């Protein structure tokens, strides 16, 4: 299914019974969070609050509150189909040389499709129907959620931040939360390794006295939103990837006040600059860990202009103890990650990010072990291969007879196949999420790998245990008798 904009997606979800319009006035201060949280935990629909208290702009919440809706947003009918997207990304990340002329011809359509999905720049766009500048810029007119009682201020959560480094051709898309601190100012909370922060750092090195242009798109089409959180190869722009998901090119328009290009179909776009050296303390906010984070300093984004549709929709979410939308996104994107990892490590049979692990902090890997020490190679590979797993604190590796998605299986493997001293890998002073207050230093902490595989000669001097297996003939006999026994 192709969705040209967010409204296309809303219409399709409503047709499928996956979206509920809320006519009752609901406040964006705490109330929307409570309603969305209850709805998400029950696997309920996306919610369109049509009458937010004190505002005339509707609020869209819980949009990606089920894995099914994430899959729909990526152009798939169910989560299982996301493996195919992962296979495409794995190929684009590390394309293999053709094995012959026939193989080369078979791969040609893939490259042609990627090339044909280069973004299309248009001259007119819905996001430019209304332009507010100067004193007319007032973020307080938007129904920006205040999610938790201890939050310091309203927080923009689903803003698609668009940046460009001074030495780069492609633009970067990232989703970074933004604390509102004035009618035209927000704090841009991007971590130092994220694309936006890297672009800004390069700008400051080259132009230390010049303001840095930034745009934030709110309410883009689902493919563009999800393209920003997917492990797209560095050689492929998020806009081009969104085109692949959508089945047609992403339409962009030049920002009014800079050379940045923004999604033409966006509901709202914030245009402005970051003045080098202008920072502010951000937080505290309730976040995906289920705790309030500590206060830290980040750049201030000054909004010089708001462009929007005449009657825009404000897209929002909240983060809290799982399950929340980031955790649900993690469940769905998990299926994209598997083929990418398998391309580099074919011995991996499954990979699972338990949603209780706050989206990415714990990973379970099953593999076909081939030699002593193999499990340790795989766990080190998980930490280093994709940027998304830089902050994964715990990696559990076990054999392919274990179901990575069944805690009963995983715990059994840990408790029967591990010696705590021999099979635990500890790595100190590694990058850790700044929101992880359990680490001894902000942004720097340790990682633990658990080798719960069968041990090979060289890893143990003892005879390894033989798993109990049932007698198939007896199982068949009892199956035949079961109805006569009257047990259930």
Swiss-Prot record:
Q: How does it sit in the membrane?
A: Peripheral membrane protein
Keyword Membrane tagged:
yes
Subcellular location as annotated = Cell membrane
Q: Name one GO molecular function term.
A: 3-octaprenyl-4-hydroxybenzoate carboxy-lyase activity
Quick one: which residues bind prenylated FMN?
Answer: 175-177, 189-191, 194-195
Residues annotated as catalytic:
287 (proton donor)
Residues binding Mn(2+), per UniProt: 172, 238
List the Gene3D superfamilies.
Answer: Single helix bin, UbiD C-terminal domain-like
What's a single GO CC term here? Answer: plasma membrane
> How is its cofactor bound, per UniProt?
Binds 1 prenylated FMN per subunit.
Q: Which reaction does it catalyse?
A: a 4-hydroxy-3-(all-trans-polyprenyl)benzoate + H(+) = a 2-(all-trans-polyprenyl)phenol + CO2
What UniProt keywords are attached to this protein's entry?
A: Cell membrane, Decarboxylase, Flavoprotein, FMN, Lyase, Manganese, Membrane, Metal-binding, Ubiquinone biosynthesis
* UniProt record similarity statement: Belongs to the UbiD family.
Biological role stated in the UniProt entry? Catalyzes the decarboxylation of 3-octaprenyl-4-hydroxy benzoate to 2-octaprenylphenol, an intermediate step in ubiquinone biosynthesis.
PANTHER family in the cross-refs: 3-OCTAPRENYL-4-HYDROXYBENZOATE CARBOXY-LYASE-RELATED, FERULIC ACID DECARBOXYLASE 1
Name the record gives this protein: 3-octaprenyl-4-hydroxybenzoate carboxy-lyase
- What gene is it encoded by? ubiD
């Amino acid at each position: 299914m192709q969705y040209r904009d967010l409204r296309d997606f809303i219409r399709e979800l409503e047709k499928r019974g996956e979206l509920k319009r809320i006519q009752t006035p609901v406040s964006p201060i705490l109330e929307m969070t409570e309603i969305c949280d209850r709805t998400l935990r029950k696997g309920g629909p996306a919610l369109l609050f049509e009458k937010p208290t004190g505002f005339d702009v509707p609020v869209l919440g819980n949009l990606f509150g089920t894995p099914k809706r994430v899959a729909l947003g990526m152009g798939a009918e169910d989560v299982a189909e996301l493996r195919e997207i992962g296979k495409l990304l794995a190929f684009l990340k590390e394309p293999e040389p053709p094995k012959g002329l026939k193989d080369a011809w078979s791969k040609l359509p893939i490259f042609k499709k990627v090339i044909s999905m280069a973004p299309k720049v248009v001259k007119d766009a819905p996001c430019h129907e209304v332009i507010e500048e100067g004193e007319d810029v007032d973020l307080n007119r938007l129904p920006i959620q205040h999610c938790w009682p201890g939050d310091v201020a309203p927080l923009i959560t689903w803003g698609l931040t668009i940046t460009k480094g001074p030495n780069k051709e492609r633009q970067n898309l990232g989703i970074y939360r933004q604390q509102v601190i004035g009618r035209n100012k927000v704090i841009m909370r991007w971590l130092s390794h994220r694309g936006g922060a890297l672009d800004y750092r390069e700008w400051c090195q080259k132009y230390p006295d010049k303001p840095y242009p930034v745009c934030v798109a709110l309410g883009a089409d689902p493919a563009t939103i999800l393209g920003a959180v997917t492990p797209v190869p560095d050689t492929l722009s998020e806009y081009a990837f969104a085109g692949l998901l959508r089945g047609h090119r992403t339409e962009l328009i030049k920002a009014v006040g800079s050379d940045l290009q923004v999604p033409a179909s966006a509901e709202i776009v914030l245009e402005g600059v970051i003045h080098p050296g202008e920072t502010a303390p951000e937080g505290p906010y309730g976040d995906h860990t289920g705790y309030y984070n500590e206060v830290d300093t980040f750049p201030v984004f000054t909004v010089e202009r708001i462009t929007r549709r005449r009657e825009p929709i404000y897209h929002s979410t909240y983060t809290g103890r799982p399950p929340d939308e980031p955790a649900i996104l993690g469940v769905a994107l998990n299926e994209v990650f598997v083929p990418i990892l398998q391309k580099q490590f074919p011995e991996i049979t499954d990979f699972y990010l338990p949603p209780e692990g706050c989206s990415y902090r714990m990973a379970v890997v099953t593999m076909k072990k081939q030699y002593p020490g193999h499990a340790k190679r795989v766990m080190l590979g998980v930490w280093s291969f994709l940027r998304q797993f830089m902050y994964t604190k715990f990696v559990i590796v076990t054999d392919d007879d274990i179901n990575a998605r069944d805690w009963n299986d995983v715990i059994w493997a840990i408790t029967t196949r591990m010696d705590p001293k021999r099979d635990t890998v500890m790595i100190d002073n590694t990058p850790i999420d700044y929101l992880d207050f359990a680490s001894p230093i902000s942004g720097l902490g340790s990682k633990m790998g658990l080798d719960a595989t069968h041990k090979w000669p060289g890893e143990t001097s003892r005879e390894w245990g033989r798993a109990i297996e049932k007698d198939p003939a007896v199982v068949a006999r009892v199956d035949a008798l079961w109805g006569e026994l009257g047990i259930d």
